């Protein structure tokens, strides 16, 4: 009974409490749950590092006086900017060797030294570092080259700390700031600010005391790097450093080093505690890299040594080092939870300069250019260092000559005046770790300061040492360590050079003669350690023809680095120095050249490699060395190396450089050839120089051209080929064949060319144009029925090679070459009939069949057995021709612009050599053919080469004089008006490389039109970087067109699958953030992309125009013909997919001519527009509360640059289950409102699109909502509810119409569809205004937000009846009186497209934000309580509980009373 009463009592209590508890659950605020709040905060910190910049601020090679893409901080800074955009938590540091190393650094010392020391001027390089906002830096060994005063002044100008812990005063105190600890505010993964103390410490090799003895001795001392670290790092920890970064200007060895080591990174990582990251340098090497794979304690994948992340990012800004640290806070302090070191190359990743760098350094750069271009003298011979490591060399000879000249003057009145003077020099620029272009290559002629700096790279000073004969020999033994040991018994090819030996340590000593026996082991290794004490590689060491005595004394003039023992050379100690000078070696060289005025730096051959029989001593040098090897007796070119830009060469000795004389009956013929010059005459005078050189070297030679002299440059535009003809006559061509472009302007212009008729282009004949002084050979082109050309048709004829000939068109000719007959016949590609404009009367017969018949006639009728086919059918067809037609000895080809730089032979019973020399007169092809007495080619006695024609080739004076007349007149041609534009044509660099522009569209349209007409193309893709300027509204001149398209690129077509086209677009979009030039401007397709995704995953959709004009998704399996330019077609700008095309062809039409032709087609008046071909979209970030936000930094860039801002969602977003709530911050709204064009924001996915004009919104935090509320029985789409809120208030009506686009479920059910407003309360539909239908997408405009869907309007233009079973309520139909009609211009369609491809969905972000409708974001990672609201809720809850409690109490009392009464 008691239990029952107790249970009843409990039930009564629960009945009383339940209602208030339920009410409380509705009233009391429920805090959001964030799992991450309980976890330790994490920070992702990126350390960006540069090292060994060596004054290379600009991407400019001052020694060759031209821009380069290979190095320069101006390019590295683009990578820095990219990483800063990707991660706000970045530090930027420099690891030393910053201010010395090129003429810009030298200029600052020579002309700004006093101002820098006094502090009245900041070192220009430091100004750049300040502008880039470096966080810290350290000193490299070369910072000490200019003395301590200059270094102090340099440091003084830095806005960032420069630290060094191991350079001390003579009393043992730190000479520089040993370390700093800076507190950084970083953002953790939850978006919260965190304070992290970052410490920086720096080190430099102790060897600076030797290398810069004259600047440092008696002033400083240098502590061992590891000792210094262990002394200093505990202090940093004690002062609270959370993270310690070692800026270590020291290299990486693979094992522990002894105290005082030059390269101590391994020891820092293994012998110290507390370092979290190490920046390495000094060696100019790469880490992480494969070189260190498998070495104990090295992890190449993670870029760590002993678990500590390390980077060594090469030199000169070629790479950026990146160390990523994952920091976790535990027990109040930060620890490194994970780390990774990596390096990122500018090659392939950067295609433009950083404006911050260029703007800051520009004036110094210009001053440096003026400085290096100042002439100081002349050289009678070329000076290069291509073979400086294997033979005596002019680039070293001129330096040693100058040093000896200086020493003789300095020592003539000293006690040493009677001692013999020797001079030591080394090749500073010899490829190696610095690449295939890192060689001295100075042509004969003027010598400027830049050339002196190229010959002597460093700021060394002259010093003279006194040594004995045995010490001189050891010096040379040390140098001889450069060579590998060769085993004659092994035979074959053996590499001569030791890759571990630095070229600047290979000293040649002039004044003595000697040989190097490389069959013996080296006495010293690359560090100067004795490894074979009894070995002696130096043989026949003599002075003035007599063997050197070990005790004989010599003076050797060298530099301060070597005289102080630099490089580990034996015997070179300070007591051996008898003359120390402050004069730089470079200054001595300059003074020598100035005094001599003209120098002849020919090597005196005082040293050589001793001959080795039975083996080939091979080595690598630049491919640019090949022409010099071809002329040399002691070096031969073997072939291309696997290393880019390098060739393989071999030494030739007396016993193998002169092969056996040819067998009786062999006859040699040298055939020089060009093809596809396309009116590129700028280097024609240089071409003539090369031709004359070959003629002077050979006895039997002819000169041929394989066609396409026409079309491609202004010279043709102005003179229709007659300027080319003038130059060809001067050069003495023996024959040419027709290319397809010879027919571009029809028979009339070709007839003028064949007759020299200048009536059209030069009526007064000021240029004295004449007919060709050579015949045209054309066996398969029949012009006999063409009235303009038939008079030129001739029968086969014999001409004397090298003499003037009568013009005419012959099927073949015979050339009499010193009594030997050589037949030449011509072939032209058969598709010329459709790809050019020959007219209907000219017939192009089958090339192979014609060749068969022609060869037969030559052999049987002419009895000639030496036959050359001069063809314009393409390289692959040339190879096929050789296989199909017997009897051809040599094919000189054209059409495909192929560079054949090594012998290609097809054996068809007898061999046929196939050649082609690329394009535009860039090369002179040369084939040296050896025939036996039967006319059969002896390929083993024949040779093929291509001779480059570039700035290193002198211009023939006579040809130059003729050419200059044409060049001068072309300046007037450039002012010729070619059209008019009603709008400015946007070629702004920042636009054409990031988005669709009207100029990009116009160019792509012209390319597509021409390629469609000539080759059936359907698509055009061109690189935005090829558009170099815009054109203002008004008249368009030819000069402006050439400024837009200055490269003279030609039209190229390639057959690509849909998959490859998408890949091409991905390649074009891979480097947009850095201003890469590959950005694809297009015609014939539309594409959508986002930069939120990584390269390779940026293209979301590609559509192509179908034959009926619709835009349909591109089929990945179908093949399409794509038009582009020849640069992109060859894989340029990273478009490698074009090189994989199933078919590729250069149509030869030059870009600016296509541009002007497009103008003519449009009536010379144009107004191109941005049409929406290219759509860049922004992917929002989904927060944990389900809302979406826009990344502030990335969206700020996007909102400014995009043509139309789009926010793109996945296919399922906006559904009933996944409503969209996009929160746009106040600053983001402001950015959108400030846009000059189309200030709007469009949200879209596959099913819908909404475009909101910013005029409808105030500058405030905004929340935009889209949600599917299901579908109606009568609707053709879901019903969507659109909302927008600002400051917590819903905005119902708008000033400007909002565009809505919805996609239908089934287009088959559509009958006059339109978008309708759904008013559930009134059970009514209202049609939106200005509707349109595009396939299955329906668009309408409204001035208020509510629910909308697609309905059929029917034939009476009325909607169906409102379904009776649909719920009512919700929308009351009152939207502030807003109508559904847009006022003003109708916005463009903003519909989306296909669903987001895999891997491109917006990613979930970290950090939460507020719920509710205001759209304002709370603090990332959690919500602070709303105190006022909470207190109010608590008071209200208390009141309700009291009231309810009282009511329940009274109710229970009444019941009890009734029970008692009962």
UniProtKB/Swiss-Prot annotation:
<keyword id="KW-0732">Signal</keyword>
<feature type="binding site">
    <location>
        <position position="708"/>
    </location>
    <ligand>
        <name>a divalent metal cation 4</name>
    </ligand>
</feature>
<dbReference type="GO" id="GO:0030288">
    <property type="term" value="C:outer membrane-bounded periplasmic space"/>
</dbReference>
<keyword id="KW-0479">Metal-binding</keyword>
<feature type="propeptide" description="Removed by sortase">
    <location>
        <begin position="1428"/>
        <end position="1462"/>
    </location>
</feature>
<dbReference type="GO" id="GO:0046872">
    <property type="term" value="F:metal ion binding"/>
</dbReference>
<keyword id="KW-0511">Multifunctional enzyme</keyword>
<dbReference type="InterPro" id="IPR041827">
    <property type="entry name" value="CpdB_N"/>
</dbReference>
<protein>
    <recommendedName>
        <fullName>Trifunctional nucleotide phosphoesterase protein YfkN</fullName>
        <ecNumber>3.1.3.6</ecNumber>
        <ecNumber>3.1.4.16</ecNumber>
        <ecNumber>3.1.3.5</ecNumber>
    </recommendedName>
</protein>
<dbReference type="InterPro" id="IPR006179">
    <property type="entry name" value="5_nucleotidase/apyrase"/>
</dbReference>
<dbReference type="GO" id="GO:0009166">
    <property type="term" value="P:nucleotide catabolic process"/>
</dbReference>
<feature type="binding site">
    <location>
        <position position="97"/>
    </location>
    <ligand>
        <name>a divalent metal cation 1</name>
    </ligand>
</feature>
<feature type="binding site">
    <location>
        <position position="141"/>
    </location>
    <ligand>
        <name>a divalent metal cation 2</name>
    </ligand>
</feature>
<comment type="similarity">
    <text>Belongs to the 5'-nucleotidase family.</text>
</comment>
<feature type="short sequence motif" description="LPXTG sorting signal">
    <location>
        <begin position="1424"/>
        <end position="1428"/>
    </location>
</feature>
<feature type="binding site">
    <location>
        <position position="740"/>
    </location>
    <ligand>
        <name>a divalent metal cation 4</name>
    </ligand>
</feature>
<dbReference type="GO" id="GO:0005576">
    <property type="term" value="C:extracellular region"/>
</dbReference>
<feature type="region of interest" description="2',3'-cyclic nucleotide 2'-phosphodiesterase/3'-nucleotidase">
    <location>
        <begin position="36"/>
        <end position="623"/>
    </location>
</feature>
<feature type="binding site">
    <location>
        <position position="678"/>
    </location>
    <ligand>
        <name>a divalent metal cation 3</name>
    </ligand>
</feature>
<feature type="region of interest" description="Disordered">
    <location>
        <begin position="1350"/>
        <end position="1422"/>
    </location>
</feature>
<feature type="signal peptide">
    <location>
        <begin position="1"/>
        <end position="35"/>
    </location>
</feature>
<feature type="binding site">
    <location>
        <position position="676"/>
    </location>
    <ligand>
        <name>a divalent metal cation 3</name>
    </ligand>
</feature>
<feature type="binding site">
    <location>
        <begin position="561"/>
        <end position="567"/>
    </location>
    <ligand>
        <name>a ribonucleoside 3'-phosphate</name>
    </ligand>
</feature>
<feature type="binding site">
    <location>
        <position position="282"/>
    </location>
    <ligand>
        <name>a divalent metal cation 2</name>
    </ligand>
</feature>
<dbReference type="InterPro" id="IPR004843">
    <property type="entry name" value="Calcineurin-like_PHP_ApaH"/>
</dbReference>
<dbReference type="Pfam" id="PF02872">
    <property type="entry name" value="5_nucleotid_C"/>
</dbReference>
<dbReference type="GO" id="GO:0008254">
    <property type="term" value="F:3'-nucleotidase activity"/>
</dbReference>
<feature type="binding site">
    <location>
        <position position="1047"/>
    </location>
    <ligand>
        <name>a ribonucleoside 5'-phosphate</name>
    </ligand>
</feature>
<keyword id="KW-0572">Peptidoglycan-anchor</keyword>
<dbReference type="GO" id="GO:0008663">
    <property type="term" value="F:2',3'-cyclic-nucleotide 2'-phosphodiesterase activity"/>
</dbReference>
<feature type="binding site">
    <location>
        <position position="52"/>
    </location>
    <ligand>
        <name>a divalent metal cation 1</name>
    </ligand>
</feature>
<dbReference type="Pfam" id="PF00149">
    <property type="entry name" value="Metallophos"/>
</dbReference>
<feature type="binding site">
    <location>
        <position position="54"/>
    </location>
    <ligand>
        <name>a divalent metal cation 1</name>
    </ligand>
</feature>
<feature type="binding site">
    <location>
        <position position="249"/>
    </location>
    <ligand>
        <name>a divalent metal cation 2</name>
    </ligand>
</feature>
<dbReference type="InterPro" id="IPR006146">
    <property type="entry name" value="5'-Nucleotdase_CS"/>
</dbReference>
<dbReference type="InterPro" id="IPR008334">
    <property type="entry name" value="5'-Nucleotdase_C"/>
</dbReference>
<keyword id="KW-0378">Hydrolase</keyword>
<dbReference type="GO" id="GO:0008253">
    <property type="term" value="F:5'-nucleotidase activity"/>
</dbReference>
<feature type="binding site">
    <location>
        <position position="897"/>
    </location>
    <ligand>
        <name>a divalent metal cation 3</name>
    </ligand>
</feature>
<dbReference type="InterPro" id="IPR029052">
    <property type="entry name" value="Metallo-depent_PP-like"/>
</dbReference>
<dbReference type="InterPro" id="IPR019931">
    <property type="entry name" value="LPXTG_anchor"/>
</dbReference>
<dbReference type="GO" id="GO:0000166">
    <property type="term" value="F:nucleotide binding"/>
</dbReference>
């Amino acid at each position: 009974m008691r239990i029952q009463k107790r249970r009843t009592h409990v039930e009564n209590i629960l009945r009383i409490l339940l209602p208030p508890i339920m009410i409380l659950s509705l009233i009391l605020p429920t805090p959001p749950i964030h799992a991450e709040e309980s976890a330790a905060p994490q920070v992702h910190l990126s350390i960006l590092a540069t090292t060994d910049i060596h004054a290379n601020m600009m991407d400019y090679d001052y020694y060759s006086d031209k821009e380069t893409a290979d190095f320069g901080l101006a390019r590295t800074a683009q990578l820095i900017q990219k990483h800063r955009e990707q991660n706000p938590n970045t530090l930027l540091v420099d690891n030393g060797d910053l201010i010395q190393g090129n003429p810009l650094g030298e200029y600052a010392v020579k002309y700004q030294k006093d101002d820098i020391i006094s502090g009245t001027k900041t070192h220009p390089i430091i100004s750049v570092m300040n502008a880039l906002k470096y966080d810290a830096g350290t000193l490299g060994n070369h910072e000490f080259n200019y003395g301590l005063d200059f270094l102090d002044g340099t440091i003084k100008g830095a806005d960032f700390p420069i630290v060094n812990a191991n350079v001390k005063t003579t009393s043992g105190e730190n000479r520089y700031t040993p370390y700093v600890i800076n507190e950084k505010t970083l953002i953790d993964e939850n978006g919260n600010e965190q304070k992290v103390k970052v410490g920086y410490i720096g080190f430099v090799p102790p060897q600076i005391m030797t290398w810069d003895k004259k600047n440092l001795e008696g002033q400083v001392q240098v502590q061992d790097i590891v000792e210094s670290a262990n002394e200093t790092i505990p202090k940093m920890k004690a002062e609270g450093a959370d993270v310690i970064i070692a800026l270590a200007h020291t290299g990486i060895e693979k094992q522990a080093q002894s105290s005082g080591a030059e390269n101590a990174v391994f020891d820092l990582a293994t012998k110290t505690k507390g370092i979290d990251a190490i920046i390495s340098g000094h060696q100019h090497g790469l880490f992480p890299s494969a070189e260190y794979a498998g070495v104990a304690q090295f992890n190449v994948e993670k870029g760590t040594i002993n678990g500590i992340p390390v980077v060594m990012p090469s030199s000169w800004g070629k790479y950026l080092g990146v160390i990523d640290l994952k920091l976790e806070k535990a027990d109040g302090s930060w620890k490194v939870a994970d780390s990774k070191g990596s390096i990122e190359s500018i090659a392939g990743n950067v295609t433009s300069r950083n404006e911050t760098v260029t703007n800051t350094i520009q004036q110094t750069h210009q001053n440096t250019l003026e400085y290096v271009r100042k002439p100081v003298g002349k050289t009678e011979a070329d000076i290069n260092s291509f073979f400086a490591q294997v033979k005596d060399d002019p680039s070293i000879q001129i330096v040693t000559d100058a040093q000896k000249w200086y020493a003789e003057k300095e020592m003539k009145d000293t006690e040493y005046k009677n001692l013999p003077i020797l001079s030591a020099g080394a090749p500073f620029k010899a490829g190696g770790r610095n690449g295939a272009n890192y060689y001295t290559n100075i042509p004969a002629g003027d010598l400027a300061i830049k050339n002196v700096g190229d010959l002597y790279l460093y700021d060394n000073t002259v010093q003279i040492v006194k040594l004995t004969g045995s010490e001189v020999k050891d010096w040379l033994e040390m140098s001889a360590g450069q060579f590998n040991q060769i085993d004659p018994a092994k035979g074959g090819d053996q590499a001569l050079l030791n890759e571990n030996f630095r070229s600047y340590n290979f000293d040649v000593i002039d004044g003595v003669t000697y040989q190097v026996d490389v069959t013996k082991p080296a006495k010293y290794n690359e560090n100067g350690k004795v490894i074979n004490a009894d070995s002696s590689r130096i043989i026949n060491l003599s002075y003035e023809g007599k063997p050197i005595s070990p005790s004989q004394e010599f003076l050797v003039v060298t530099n301060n680095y070597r005289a102080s023992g630099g490089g580990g050379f034996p015997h070179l100690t300070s007591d051996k120095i008898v003359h120390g000078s402050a004069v730089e070696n470079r200054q001595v060289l300059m003074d020598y050249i100035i005094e001599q005025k003209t120098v002849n730096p020919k090597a005196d051959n005082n040293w050589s490699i001793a001959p080795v029989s039975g083996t080939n001593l091979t080595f690598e040098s630049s491919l640019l060395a090949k022409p010099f090897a071809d002329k040399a007796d002691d070096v031969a070119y073997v072939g291309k190396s696997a290393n880019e830009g390098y060739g393989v060469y071999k030494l030739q000795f007396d016993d193998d450089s002169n092969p056996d004389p040819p067998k009786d009956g062999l006859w040699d013929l040298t055939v020089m050839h060009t093809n596809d010059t396309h009116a590129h005459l700028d280097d024609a005078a240089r071409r003539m120089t090369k031709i004359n050189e070959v003629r002077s070297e050979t006895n039997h030679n002819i000169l041929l051209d394989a066609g396409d002299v026409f079309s491609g440059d202004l010279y043709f535009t102005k003179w229709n080929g007659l300027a080319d003809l003038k130059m060809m006559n001067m050069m003495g061509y023996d024959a040419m064949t027709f290319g397809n472009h010879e027919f571009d302007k029809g028979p009339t212009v070709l007839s003028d060319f064949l007759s020299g008729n200048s009536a059209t282009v030069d009526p007064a004949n000021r240029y004295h144009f004449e007919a060709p002084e050579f015949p045209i050979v054309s066996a398969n082109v029949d012009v006999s029925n063409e009235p303009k050309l038939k008079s030129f048709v001739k029968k086969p004829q014999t001409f004397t090679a090298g003499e003037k000939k009568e013009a005419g068109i012959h099927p073949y000719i015979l050339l009499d070459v010193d009594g030997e007959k050589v037949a030449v016949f011509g072939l032209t590609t058969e598709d010329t009939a459709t790809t050019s404009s020959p007219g209907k009367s000219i017939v192009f017969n089958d090339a192979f069949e014609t060749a068969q018949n022609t060869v037969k006639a030559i052999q049987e009728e002419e009895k000639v057995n030496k036959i050359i086919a001069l063809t314009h059918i393409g390289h692959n067809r040339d190879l096929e021709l050789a296989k199909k037609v017997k009897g051809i000895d040599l094919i000189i080809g054209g059409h495909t612009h192929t560079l054949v730089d090594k012998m290609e032979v097809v054996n068809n019973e007898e061999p046929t050599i196939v050649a082609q020399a690329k394009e535009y007169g860039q090369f002179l092809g040369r084939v040296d053919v050896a025939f036996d007495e039967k006319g059969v080619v002896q390929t083993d006695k024949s040779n093929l080469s291509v001779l480059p024609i570039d700035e290193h080739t002198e211009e023939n004076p006579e040809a130059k004089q003729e050419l200059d007349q044409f060049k001068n007149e072309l300046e007037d041609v450039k002012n010729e008006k070619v059209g008019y534009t009603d709008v400015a044509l946007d070629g702004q660099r920042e636009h054409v490389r990031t988005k669709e522009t009207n100029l990009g569209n116009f160019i792509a349209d012209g390319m597509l039109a021409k390629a469609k007409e000539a080759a059936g193309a359907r698509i055009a893709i061109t690189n935005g970087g090829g558009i170099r300027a815009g054109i203002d509204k008004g008249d368009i001149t030819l000069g402006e067109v050439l400024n837009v398209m200055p490269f003279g690129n030609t039209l190229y077509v390639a057959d690509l699958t849909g998959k490859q086209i998408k890949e091409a677009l991905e390649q074009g979009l891979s480097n947009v953030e850095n201003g890469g030039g590959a950005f694809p401007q297009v015609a014939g397709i539309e594409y959508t992309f986002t930069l939120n995704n990584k390269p390779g995953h940026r293209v979301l959709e590609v559509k192509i125009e179908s034959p009926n004009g619709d835009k349909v998704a591109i089929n990945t399996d179908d093949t399409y013909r794509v038009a582009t330019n020849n640069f992109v077609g060859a894989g340029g700008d990273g478009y490698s997919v074009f090189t994989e095309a199933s078919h590729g062809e250069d149509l030869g039409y030059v870009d600016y001519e296509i541009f002007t032709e497009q103008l003519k087609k449009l009536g010379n008046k144009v107004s191109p527009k941005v049409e929406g071909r290219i759509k860049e979209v922004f992917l929002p970030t989904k927060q944990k509360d389900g809302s979406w936000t826009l990344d502030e930094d990335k969206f700020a860039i996007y909102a400014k640059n995009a043509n139309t801002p789009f926010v793109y969602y996945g296919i399922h977003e906006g559904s009933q289950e996944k409503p969209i709530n996009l929160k746009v911050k106040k600053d983001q709204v402001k950015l959108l409102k400030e846009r000059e064009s189309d200030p709007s924001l469009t949200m879209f996915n596959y099913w819908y699109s909404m475009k909101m004009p910013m005029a409808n919104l105030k500058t405030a935090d905004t929340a935009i909502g889209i949600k599917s509320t299901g579908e109606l029985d009568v609707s053709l789409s879901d019903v969507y509810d659109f909302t927008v809120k600002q400051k917590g208030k819903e905005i119902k009506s708008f000033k400007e119409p909002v565009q809505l686009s919805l996609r239908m479920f089934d287009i088959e059910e559509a009958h006059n569809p339109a978008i309708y407003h759904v008013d559930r309360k009134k059970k009514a539909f209202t049609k939106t205004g200005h509707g349109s239908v595009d396939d299955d997408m329906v668009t309408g405009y409204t001035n208020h937000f509510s629910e909308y869907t697609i309905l059929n309007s029917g034939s009476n233009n009325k909607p169906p009846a409102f379904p009776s079973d649909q719920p009512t309520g919700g929308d009351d139909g009152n939207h502030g009186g807003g109508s559904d009609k847009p006022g003003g211009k109708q916005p463009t369609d903003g519909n989306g497209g296909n669903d987001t491809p895999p891997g491109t969905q917006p990613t979930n972000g970290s950090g939460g934000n507020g719920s509710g409708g205001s759209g304002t974001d709370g603090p990332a990672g959690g919500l602070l309580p709303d105190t006022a609201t909470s207190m109010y809720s608590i008071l209200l809850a208390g009141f309700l509980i009291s009231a309810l409690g009282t009511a329940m109490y009274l109710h229970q009392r009444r019941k009890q009373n009734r029970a008692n009464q009962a």
